[in-house]
UniProtKB/Swiss-Prot annotation:
<dbReference type="GO" id="GO:0047056">
    <property type="term" value="F:(S)-canadine synthase activity"/>
</dbReference>
<keyword id="KW-0479">Metal-binding</keyword>
<dbReference type="GO" id="GO:0102632">
    <property type="term" value="F:(S)-nandinine synthase activity"/>
</dbReference>
<dbReference type="InterPro" id="IPR036396">
    <property type="entry name" value="Cyt_P450_sf"/>
</dbReference>
<keyword id="KW-1133">Transmembrane helix</keyword>
<keyword id="KW-0472">Membrane</keyword>
<feature type="transmembrane region" description="Helical">
    <location>
        <begin position="16"/>
        <end position="36"/>
    </location>
</feature>
<keyword id="KW-0503">Monooxygenase</keyword>
<keyword id="KW-0408">Iron</keyword>
<comment type="function">
    <text>Methylenedioxy bridge-forming cytochrome P450 involved in the biosynthesis of isoquinoline alkaloids. Converts (S)-cheilanthifoline to (S)-stylopine, (S)-scoulerine to (S)-nandinine and (S)-tetrahydrocolumbamine to (S)-canadine. Can be involved in both sanguinarine and berberine biosynthesis. Catalyzes an oxidative reaction that does not incorporate oxygen into the product.</text>
</comment>
<feature type="binding site" description="axial binding residue">
    <location>
        <position position="448"/>
    </location>
    <ligand>
        <name>heme</name>
    </ligand>
</feature>
<protein>
    <recommendedName>
        <fullName>Trifunctional (S)-stylopine synthase/(S)-nandinine synthase/(S)-canadine synthase</fullName>
        <ecNumber>1.14.19.64</ecNumber>
        <ecNumber>1.14.19.68</ecNumber>
        <ecNumber>1.14.19.73</ecNumber>
    </recommendedName>
</protein>
<dbReference type="InterPro" id="IPR001128">
    <property type="entry name" value="Cyt_P450"/>
</dbReference>
<dbReference type="GO" id="GO:0005789">
    <property type="term" value="C:endoplasmic reticulum membrane"/>
</dbReference>
<comment type="similarity">
    <text>Belongs to the cytochrome P450 family.</text>
</comment>
<dbReference type="GO" id="GO:0033075">
    <property type="term" value="P:isoquinoline alkaloid biosynthetic process"/>
</dbReference>
<keyword id="KW-0812">Transmembrane</keyword>
Length: 504
């Protein structure tokens, strides 16, 4: 019915169409009011740390955009304190910690109190109903799954046995980069090459088999990219209670379901492989988990392992391009070591002997922590923070980026300076303070399960790529863009392009 407004010696009279619309709007506003009141009531049982002033419905969302979230929160902490409350929408407060002492309280000293997770609802579709290491609350299931990954697939013996295969992989990566450079006037995009090498490595640890055929590697790589793309919708639903009813969110659910099916189609046929006893697949099957749990435990290893290591390596190469003196100093260390030991490449057993390499690795992870906000923790019981009561269910986020850029710990924190890790004492700041503040893999009981693998592969790839090539800008004076893009991990907003010249 067409909407009309009539005057008839009486107040404004609205036709049925307008009345219906008004009723719906009033009902919606009333519902939102009840939800906000309910959440405000439940939140009032504890005294929340101070934070920015909130707006109705959107909370603090108006000040959280414009740049990477971890940087915004780091800057806000300078005004509101190193323990502050941020409202993601008007119904989800989160305590943000940017201080090393409070971070250790949450992550280490009271690790079991803050060991639960609070994941966006849409992530259920890609985690077998939150039955993966990163998504599940701590408990017997989580403990068993984590031990299986760390003590079986990622055991020191197993990682050591991979060295000859990884040496072959890096030789193949170097050859592929040479071929790409030959076809593109010396210009390469290294990220995809690094990702495919990581897919191969993780595949061997999971299945105990080598994938010489690139079809599985390509498909897994593409599936990871697709799931990362659609996961961005989860943030909208996390911020606004009614966002899950929007067409865009429903579309996202359909796309995640499609990605879910792709994962299952990719992994399920491999569940029947006759895998060795030292593989992740063998462990998972021995626990009699449902197939879906096994499939997404396997996919999680790819999801969190591939992008994290390859992106960190790309960040390091970008810094070395911007700091040619650092690159040459690193190359001199690598060249002298390989010459002295009559080797053409750096091997795994060499990595801890190369002090400057390890300094570059640490400085890259300090500057660009792969998970700058980690995965938010949730209090699984009533506990405390700074002596103040914290309710069960409270979300706490530790800003790793802020810890890594604290000027009281790090001299010139925004400068890429590997030498800081080679100095016993820098202007009164001791090495212990730096060690405690450097948490690229988080800390405590929920520290990254793949930490050792990540550090080894990053160091190994970086050493051999710098030993093989001189890395430079694609054109004079055009340095790599160091802008962040935060997805599952911290990515380069503009994927790295570089000029390479073979050194040998």
């Amino acid at each position: 019915m067409e909407e009309k407004i009539m005057t008839n010696n009486s107040p404004w009279i609205l036709t049925s169409s307008t009345t219906t619309t008004t009723t719906i709007l009033l009902s919606l506003l009333f519902t939102i009011f009840i939800i906000l009141r309910r959440n405000k009531s439940s939140s009032s049982k504890m005294v929340w740390p101070t934070g920015p002033k909130t707006l109705p419905i959107i909370g603090n969302m108006n000040i959280l955009g414009g740049t990477a979230l971890h940087v915004v929160l780091h800057n806000l902490a300078k005004t509101y304190g190193n323990v502050m409350t941020i409202w993601i929408g008007s119904w989800r407060p989160v305590i943000v910690v940017s201080d090393i002492d409070r971070a250790w309280e949450v992550l280490v000293n009271k690790s079991s109190d803050y060991s639960a997770r609070d994941m966006p609802e849409i992530t259920k579709l890609a985690t077998a109903d939150w039955k993966t290491i990163s998504s599940s609350d701590s408990g017997p299931f989580w403990t068993n799954l984590r031990k299986g990954l760390q003590n079986v697939a990622l055991s020191p013996q197993n990682l050591s046995s991979q060295s000859k295969f990884q040496e072959r992989d890096i030789i193949k990566t170097i050859q592929n980069l040479k071929e790409e450079a030959k076809m593109n006037n010396g210009i390469v995009k290294p990220l995809d090459h690094l990702k495919k090498a990581m897919v191969r490595l993780i595949s061997r640890l999971i299945y105990g088999q080598d994938f010489d055929n690139d079809e599985y590697v390509e498909e897994m790589h593409h599936t990871i990219e697709e799931l990362i793309r659609v996961s961005g919708y989860a943030r909208l639903a996390e911020a606004f209670y009614y966002a899950k009813y929007l067409p865009s969110h429903k579309k996202a659910v359909r796309e995640v379901l499609q990605a879910n099916q792709r994962v299952q189609n990719l992994v399920r046929p491999l569940l029947s492989l006759n895998s060795p006893t030292n593989t992740y697949l063998h462990f998972l099957r021995s626990q009699n988990y449902e197939d879906e749990v096994i499939i997404f435990a396997i996919f999680e290893a790819y999801l969190l392992g591939v992008d994290s290591t390859s992106s960190t390596t790309a960040w390091a190469l970008a810094y070395l391009i911007r700091e040619p003196n650092v690159q040459e100093k690193l190359y001199e260390e690598l060249k002298n070591f390989t010459n002295d030991n009559d080797r053409k490449m750096v091997k795994f057993e060499d990595l801890n002997k190369l002090q400057y390499l390890q300094a570059v690795v640490k400085e890259t992870m300090r500057m660009k922590p792969i998970a700058p906000l980690a995965i938010p923790h949730k209090a699984c019981r009533e506990t405390s923070l700074m002596g103040r009561k914290v309710n069960q269910g409270t979300r706490v986020m530790v800003n790793i980026y802020a810890l890594h850029h604290n000027q009281n710990v790090w001299k010139e924190p925004y400068k890429f300076n590997p030498e800081r890790f080679l100095q016993k004492n820098q202007d009164g700041v001791d090495g212990k303070a730096m060690e405690q503040s450097l948490l690229p893999f988080s800390a405590g009981m929920r520290i990254c399960a793949g930490m050792e693998l990540g550090k080894l592969q990053f160091s190994f790839a970086l050493a051999n790529l710098v030993n093989a090539f001189k890395w430079s800008c694609v054109s004079d004076g055009v340095f790599p863009d160091m802008s962040d893009q935060l997805g599952f991990v911290l990515l380069m907003k503009t994927p790295l392009e570089a000029g390479i010249v073979p050194r040998m």
